């Protein structure tokens, strides 16, 4: 199998072209490009609002995409929300669940290795609600300080919002253990899987996270596509 042949960009670049910036954004796979072309060429219509054939086809393909994403992370289709990016997915959690459920003296825990897209929304929520934003420190080797995490995990901690894999160092956080300890404390957990989703198999039922976000552009799909997974009981409530 020639992997380069699956990415059309290599056909227009010189033969020595090598791409090393996939941590920032991935090249687009031929299947993603061809599917977008198929939609725009064959059934470019609004979804969920019409009964004429191409609209029904567009709706079917849209919901089929949702089913495939759900299957990919082992969730229910009803637990998948499409957004424009992982960043928008985090914002949606922060400004819906966060503003509705957090109050003065509640605590949000994030780590010092977070991407700014998982910092700024919680800073805003803390300012609006009076809750407290605390940071889990990072050790000299770049790994999460798990002893400090456990000491910070008080009864006031209502949410942990944590990156799965660092976009800077590639460090993979032990999210299963963190989620287990959080749930024992009555704390919800949001996982930013934007960096890890292309490299690590993620089963949301197994890891038992409450929310999970990722984006298409870091897994060979188009820009402007993101995913928010949320446990159904939380989505229904918020």
Model-derived features with residue positions:
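Pyridoxal 5′-phosphate
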Residues: 1-238
């Amino acid at each position: 199998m020639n992997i380069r042949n699956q990415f059309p960009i290599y056909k227009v670049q010189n033969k020595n072209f090598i791409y090393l910036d996939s941590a920032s954004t991935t090249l687009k796979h031929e299947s993603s490009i061809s599917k977008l072309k198929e939609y725009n060429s064959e059934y470019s219509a609004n979804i969920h609002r019409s009964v004429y054939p191409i609209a029904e086809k567009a709706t079917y393909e849209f919901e089929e995409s949702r089913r495939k994403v759900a299957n990919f992370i082992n969730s229910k289709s009803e637990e998948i929300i499409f957004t424009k990016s992982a960043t928008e997915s985090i914002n949606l959690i922060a400004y819906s669940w966060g503003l509705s459920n957090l109050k003065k003296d509640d605590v949000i825990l994030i780590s010092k290795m977070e991407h700014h897209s998982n910092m700024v929304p919680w800073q805003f929520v803390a300012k609006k609600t009076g809750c407290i934003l605390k940071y889990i420190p990072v050790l000299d080797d770049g790994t999460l300080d798990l002893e400090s995490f456990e000491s910070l995990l008080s009864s006031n901690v209502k949410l942990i919002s944590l990156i799965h894999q660092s976009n800077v160092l590639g460090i993979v956080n032990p999210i299963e253990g963190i989620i287990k300890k959080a749930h024992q404390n009555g704390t919800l957990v949001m996982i930013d899987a934007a960096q890890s989703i292309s490299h690590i198999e993620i089963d949301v039922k197994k890891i038992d996270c409450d929310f999970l976000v990722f984006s298409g552009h870091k897994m060979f799909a188009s820009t402007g596509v993101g995913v928010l997974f949320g446990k159904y009981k939380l989505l229904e409530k918020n």
